[in-house]
Design a protein with these regions (language model features):
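Active-site residues of response regulator receiver
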Residues: 8, 52-54, 83
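Short hydrophobic/Thr-rich beta-strand motif most characteristic of the beta2 strand and flanking loop
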Residues: 25-34, 40
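Active-site beta3 strand of CheY-like receiver
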Residues: 44-50, 55
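C-terminal output helix
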Residues: 87-89, 107-116
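AAA+ ATPase active-site-proximal loops
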Residues: 133-151
Length: 151
C-alpha cells in the first residue's frame, strides 16, 4: 500500500483528504506544521506528500519554504501543493521549487485521486529508470568492445 503524508494546518482539510485517499486504499498520516512534517519524515516514509502553502502562524516555515526543505531531504518524493489563496505566480513558484503539481481549494476529490495516482506512478517509474541506468552503466563498455557486434 502506498503512503501519503498530508501537511495542512486545517484539521478538516486533513481529514477530508485522508478520507478521500483511504477510500482508494492509501495509508495516510497528517501533520499541521513544518516542524511536525520534518519530524514525521524521519519515521514515516511517504510515497507522496500533499502540502498546503499556508501552514498558519504555528509553523516555522511556510509551504514553499517547507517544499524546499523536503527537496533537500528527499527530492524523489513527489509533492502536490494545495492552497486556498492561489495565483499563477504561486503555482509556478511551487513547481520551480520541486512540486509535482498544484491544486487550488476548494478541490475536487477526483482530482486529488488522479493526481495522487499519477504522482506516485511517475515517482516509481523514475526510481526504476534510475535503477536501470545503474545496471546498464557498468555494462556499457562491454557492448562497445564486443567482437560479436557488427555495425
Amino acid at each position: 500500500m502506498n503512503k501519503i503524508l498530508i501537511i495542512d494546518d486545517e484539521k478538516d482539510i486533513c481529514y477530508l483528504i485522508s478520507e478521500i485517499l483511504h477510500d482508494e486504499k492509501y495509508i495516510t498520516e497528517s501533520v499541521s506544521n513544518s516542524s511536525e512534517a520534518i519530524k514525521k519524515l524521519e519515521t514515516f516514509r511517504p510515497d507522496l506528500i500533499i502540502l498546503d502553502v499556508w501552514l498558519g502562524p504555528n509553523s516555522e516555515l511556510d509551504g514553499i519554504e517547507l517544499l524546499k526543505k523536503i527537496m533537500t531531504i528527499n527530492s524523489l518524493i513527489p509533492v502536490i501543493v494545495i492552497t486556498g489563496h492561489g495565483t499563477v505566480d504561486m503555482a509556478v513558484n511551487a513547481i520551480k521549487n520541486g512540486a509535482y503539481d498544484f491544486i487550488e481549494k476548494p478541490f475536487n476529490s477526483e482530482k486529488i485521486i488522479i493526481l495522487s495516482k499519477r504522482a506516485i506512478e511517475s515517482a516509481k517509474l523514475a526510481d526504476e529508470n534510475k535503477l536501470l541506468k545503474k545496471i546498464a552503466h557498468p555494462n556499457t563498455p562491454l557492448i562497445g568492445n564486443s567482437s560479436f557486434i557488427i555495425i
